[in-house]
């Protein structure tokens, strides 16, 4: 819901020192985010998120991983992209971005057929979906853009207040009890976003078209990230009991085969895992931390902002047991800035895998450098205090 500059400003106002942009199929926000954080005295981490074929040739390919919509398809992120590599990243993402747009336009036809069958006015995909996006500036089109257009059409058609929830019931949309009141509130300023979340969790499957050729393999994502000096990650979701944003229904994901998953992650060269502490239980967090340590993987934490009700603060990360995650974040800030100056200053080394002890030492060296850069010290000067691995 925010531009990169607006997101950085809100993060700063909420007391954060690091903010990032990791958009679907796009690196387009990176330059603005980096500039905004520099002005605000913050650290930044930029990259992109992408869906990839995962576990090909293994039982994982037949399982639902961290993606509620598809079997054998995983969300991955590529973070800490050096500034000189942004153009190459944009070129690599372009074919998949275009293919996803075409698939989403086909889904829009299905959504409009549903609206028409309900006697409601359909939306204009170009004006109401593509037009509200940053696609023309290199941004991506996702199901959220589609569902925003559909949600707006439903609100226009059914009207606000109880009539909306009555109309949703007529459609067969299951509205969680926790959201029934806000969806019936005619004065709700976030109504479109609230309805979008409900549609994503409980209705998207009726119009969804599975991706095919647009998806790279997970191994290809890792290889590309390594080639540009960035860090590829698997985005751990974990079994969901309740979604804080209302956009995921209770469902089982990776927890039953997490050990097997980490073995495969290591086998394809993944050297990092990312997760969101507010969305997992203490037991899940302890397990993911233990597995990451056992496999020598950098742990990256953060929370994506999908709608304006979400807070920018993350109280979990203030707890003492998560101090290492904060240090890793600062190390990642240093990685992006320093490897933009000198590619040999990659946090994890351009190749190979660090031992848990070496990784901890590397983070302790880089975290203060990330803070220095956020405080305004020139990255080229800070680079003189860093060391390369290979």
List the predicted regions and their residue ranges.
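Phosphodiester-processing cores and adjacent nucleic acid-binding clamps
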Residues: 19, 42-59, 71-79, 104-106, ...
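Active-site gating loops and adjacent loop-to-helix segments of metal-dependent hydrolytic enzymes
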Residues: 56-99, 148-206, 318-339, 346-347
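An N-terminally biased module of ancient metal coordination in phosphate/nucleic-acid-related enzymes
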Residues: 1-72, 196-224, 228-229, 234-310, ...
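Charged, amphipathic alpha-helical linkers/stalks
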Residues: 84-92, 106-109, 342-363
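Non-catalytic, alpha-helical, charged scaffold/linker segments
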Residues: 84-176, 370-389
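Short, charged low-complexity intrinsically disordered segments located at boundaries
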Residues: 135-146, 181-183, 359-364
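Outer-membrane beta-barrel translocator/channel fold
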Residues: 310-318
């Amino acid at each position: 819901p925010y531009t990169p500059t607006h997101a950085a400003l809100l993060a700063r106002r909420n007391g954060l020192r690091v903010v990032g942009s990791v958009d679907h199929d796009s690196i387009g926000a990176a330059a603005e985010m980096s500039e905004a954080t520099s002005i605000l005295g913050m650290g930044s981490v930029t990259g992109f998120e992408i869906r990839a074929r995962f576990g090909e040739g293994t039982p994982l390919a037949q399982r639902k991983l961290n993606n509620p919509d598809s079997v054998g398809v995983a969300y991955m992120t590529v973070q800490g992209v050096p500034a000189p590599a942004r153009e190459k990243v944009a070129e690599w993402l372009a074919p998949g971005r275009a293919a996803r747009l075409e698939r989403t336009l086909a889904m829009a036809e299905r959504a409009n057929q549903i609206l028409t069958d309900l006697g409601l006015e359909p939306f204009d995909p170009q004006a109401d979906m593509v037009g509200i996006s940053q696609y023309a500036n290199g941004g991506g089109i996702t199901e959220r853009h589609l569902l925003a257009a559909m949600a707006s059409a439903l609100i226009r058609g059914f009207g606000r207040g109880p009539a909306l929830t009555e109309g949703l019931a007529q459609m067969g949309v299951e509205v969680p009890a926790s959201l029934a009141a806000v969806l019936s509130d005619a004065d709700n300023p976030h109504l479109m976003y609230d309805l979008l979340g409900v549609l994503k969790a409980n209705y998207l499957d009726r119009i969804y078209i599975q991706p095919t050729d647009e998806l790279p393999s997970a191994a290809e994502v890792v290889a590309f990230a390594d080639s540009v000096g960035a860090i590829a990650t698997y985005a751990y979701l974990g079994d969901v009991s309740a979604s804080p944003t209302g956009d995921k229904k209770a469902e089982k994901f990776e927890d039953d085969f997490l050990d097997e998953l980490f073995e495969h992650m290591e086998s394809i060269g993944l050297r990092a895992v990312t997760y969101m502490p507010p969305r997992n239980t203490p037991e899940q967090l302890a397990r993911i931390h233990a597995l990451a340590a056992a496999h020598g993987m950098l742990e990256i934490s953060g929370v994506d902002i999908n709608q304006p009700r979400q807070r920018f603060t993350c109280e979990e990360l203030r707890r003492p047991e998560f101090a290492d995650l904060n240090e890793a974040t600062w190390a990642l800030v240093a990685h992006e800035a320093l490897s933009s100056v000198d590619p040999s200053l990659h946090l994890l080394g351009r190749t190979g895998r660090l031992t848990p002890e070496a990784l901890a030492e590397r983070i302790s060296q880089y975290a203060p450098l990330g803070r220095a850069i956020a405080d305004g010290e020139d990255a080229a000067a800070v680079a003189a205090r860093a060391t390369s691995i290979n």
